[in-house]
């Protein structure tokens, strides 16, 4: 049995199958640290976690880390929970307010702004979500995670970033991947792999363990929008994102 393992996982609906699997895998005794994606990466960097689900954009900067498992948080087409929302068509957007809970999504919107939408907006940090209720002409908001569900239908224009990436590159997208500290035993790697497999194979049961069970969209989202398999095409997509997407970083105006 793999014991005393500290695992940082994302506290969003998209990670519920992973969390369920980790909690129910008999050969894995782990301490779970749940947080938004950016904090999962920080927990790994600070040595608080041995294994972590981290934004794909940060992996090249992690020291002493290696990619593990055949699983990820990915999408083939629309992901639904990483969306640029606006009452202005994207070609006329002047300001983009960024949700910094995931470095990957921030990098991705920067890549799409330059290469797909051909715009050069002012980039601003979104800390006050009441700004969404006071949107001005030319404003757009990058929203990430479960909060997107609360704002669906509020804006006239919604640009799903995974869908926009696929139109641009003809590839799926990888938002988050599993990493581990180099040197962890085979038993740990195997136990984590088995745990994630169990969770992905029991999505319905995983939802019953959570408040999301009563939400009609939850099962559809996890089975139709999120693609958990880190397959060959997603490896290709991740390499392309690392080669090109990371070169375009939105320069945020501090205000």
Task: Please provide the spans of the model-predicted regions.
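Short, well-ordered beta-strand elements
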Residues: 2-11, 30-33, 94-97
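Beta->alpha turn/N-cap motifs
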Residues: 12-14, 36-38, 48-60, 71, ...
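A bilobed periplasmic-binding-protein/Venus flytrap-type ligand-binding module shared by bacterial periplasmic
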Residues: 21, 81-90, 95, 173-187
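Short helix-initiation/N-cap motifs at beta->coil->alpha
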Residues: 31-42, 120-137
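A conserved helix-loop-strand patch within extracytoplasmic ligand-binding domains
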Residues: 71-130, 165-166
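Ligand-binding clefts/hinges and TM-proximal coupling segments of bilobed small-molecule sensing domains
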Residues: 103-127, 179-225, 229
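Pocket-lining segment of extracytoplasmic ligand-binding domains
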Residues: 125-208
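An extracytoplasmic/periplasmic, membrane-proximal ligand-sensing/linker region
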Residues: 148, 208-255
């Amino acid at each position: 049995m793999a014991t005393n393992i500290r695992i940082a996982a994302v506290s969003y609906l998209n990670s519920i199958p992973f969390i369920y699997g980790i909690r129910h895998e008999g050969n894995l005794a782990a301490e779970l640290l749940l947080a938004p994606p950016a904090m999962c990466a920080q927990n790994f960097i600070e040595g608080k976690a041995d294994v972590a689900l981290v934004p794909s954009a940060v992996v090249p900067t992690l020291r002493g880390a290696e990619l593990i498992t055949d699983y990820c948080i990915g999408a083939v087409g629309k992901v639904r929970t990483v969306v640029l929302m606006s009452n202005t068509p994207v070609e006329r957007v002047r300001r983009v307010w960024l949700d910094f809970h995931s470095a990957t999504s921030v990098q991705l919107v920067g890549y799409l702004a330059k290469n797909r939408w051909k715009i050069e907006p002012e980039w601003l940090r979104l800390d006050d979500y009441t700004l969404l209720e006071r949107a001005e002409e030319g404003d757009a908001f990058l929203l990430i995670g479960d909060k997107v569900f609360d704002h669906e239908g509020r804006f006239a224009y919604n640009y799903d970033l995974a869908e926009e990436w696929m139109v641009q590159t003809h590839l799926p997208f990888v938002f988050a991947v599993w990493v581990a500290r180099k040197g962890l035993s085979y038993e740990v790697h195997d136990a984590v792999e088995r745990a994630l497999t169990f969770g992905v194979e029991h999505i319905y049961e995983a939802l019953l363990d959570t408040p999301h069970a009563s939400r009609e969209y939850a099962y559809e989202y996890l089975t139709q929008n999120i693609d958990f398999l880190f397959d060959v095409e997603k490896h290709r997509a991740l390499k392309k994102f690392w080669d090109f997407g990371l070169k375009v970083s939105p320069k945020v105006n501090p205000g």
